[in-house]
């Protein structure tokens, strides 16, 4: 690839970014798009719907950039939680590291590479990108010490910044733990693989076991029931309420003058009845509700203890000599529980993990074919030879630049859109009991997949057979990487343009949400001001951020021309991600900063990989002095990684007993323990309820990951048909085991069996 092809790709992507960002600055001002670009603020009720002047609404403005820049870390922590702060700290750490890397490499390494004597120089726009790489140096060049010294500076700066950031994030996590005093998960242990007894139920078995062995600390427990029936009933009832809500007020809000056989004549308003029923449900205490149906108990229970320390001890010790029974773990937060996966038998989990690992590896190798095809596009002689009918087209200068500089990265990015949903599906099949754990598992899978396919497969590709041939010679891996990385420097730059710059522009534009909102408002004619609240996609954005960090480290002393483009990406990411976090995405669950070890370990891996590649290149250039100095650098980096693992990693894996005991003593002194114990069953109940405050913002149950989609607007002539169908469906699902109270209205169309009628007071 030459400079003109690189500039063509950069120009196309810059134009795309400018257009999308300009459109965003206009579309975000339109009141009809508030639900797309201000979802989090709308859910908090903090957006005032006002129409600015017409000429201001259609003029691009950088006000959102100023707002994102001025948002402090404390504001983000209060609004979006610790995970959002940790993610922004990842971006900031990347900016700091690569600012130093860019200054060192652009000031010293790049001039040395460019003025090497191995390649012949041409006009600037016709220059091959190889003249900017270390390949342009002759063997035994006396300038290789510049690369070795730069590698030492880069490694020292990166390790120092990583250490201080790790220390800072660890303090934030400890503050997060001590600051969440009323979290029910600190008092709760999730017990799985409860043994079945022919003489008693699972609930009785749990009560007997913990009363026997943990009598001083055991409070109570809550069994997990088969969720299929409960969720279907709740979802259909919610849909019926949505359907009635969307009915035209002229037809639905008039008082009903029909008489009821049981209740007598009454002039009632159907919507007023539903409102009153909802208020009565909210008045019930969930701790007083039990299932009246014959729901099947699962061998899973939430067990509550008197103190945080008691729950911590129970979760850490082995309960029985058989480790496959009475498996105890600290429970996730109520809104973080993945209720559907709790029904998976514990003995199946290890088989599921193996199966998903095999499936992910198989998909990784299947993905070799599109990656190899993409690499074929970058080789014009091979492309002309295999497709003779394209020869005339490829001889045109502009088409050559587009095909070699822009098209390969676009095709690869499009193929990668299939990866996150599949990896999330694999993580769900693993049986993760919490949604944050599932998202972190998907993040790791996507990270490994991305590094393997974008970096290793691309630099080793010629054909699938040749890749296996190269990988068989493990001893020659550093030398092979040193030969192939400079050759792919141009592709990595164009991938930074397409996946990095243009990807961020698409992220802020939210094209899927915008199109969906347009369909709902224009085609479906939905006048309801509804919106879907989204969660931040850590499982896709963290791997992307780390991939560009890997490309920056591995190309720093080999092909430093990529560094300014990466810095632009990181600065752009800092502003856009902050804007999205404070305006668009909501936080219903989080991992407590557990993504930071992923960032730290991957950055260390990237740093060591860059040192190994440099070692291989010093060997190819026959520089024994530079090779000798690089080996101790690799060992020192490994020692630093091990120190950080011993010093900081346990903080992100376990809770410190010292902090939990201090929190227990503080709650005992203030008399909060009894209140916390009374709320434990309410928090982990499978029955969803809304408080007055949460109902204003659109409450969701702990069982659901996303809000229910709004029903389509009903036509007046189809009102009775739709309502009759829902009513009959509810009655058929209820069966004879449910006690459904009669409604004061004459028509069943205008009523729904509330949740208070499905359950009774104990």
UniProtKB/Swiss-Prot annotation:
Keyword tags? Calcium, Ion channel, Ion transport, Membrane, Transmembrane, Transmembrane helix, Transport
Any stretches that span the bilayer, and where are they?
3-23, 90-110, 144-164, 354-374, 402-422, 445-465, 500-520, 557-577, 594-614, 615-635
Spell out the InterPro entries in the cross-references: Csc1-like, CSC1/OSCA1-like_7TM, CSC1/OSCA1-like_cyt, Csc1/OSCA1-like_N
Where does it live in the cell? Answer: Membrane
The molecular function terms of the Gene Ontology recorded here are: calcium-activated cation channel activity
Gene Ontology, cellular component aspect? membrane
Highest rank taxon of the organism: Eukaryota
User: How does this chain sit within the bilayer?
Assistant: Multi-pass membrane protein
Q: What does this protein do?
A: Acts as an osmosensitive calcium-permeable cation channel.
The entry sums up its family as follows: Belongs to the CSC1 (TC 1.A.17) family.
Name assigned to this protein: Hyperosmolality-gated Ca2+ permeable channel 2.2
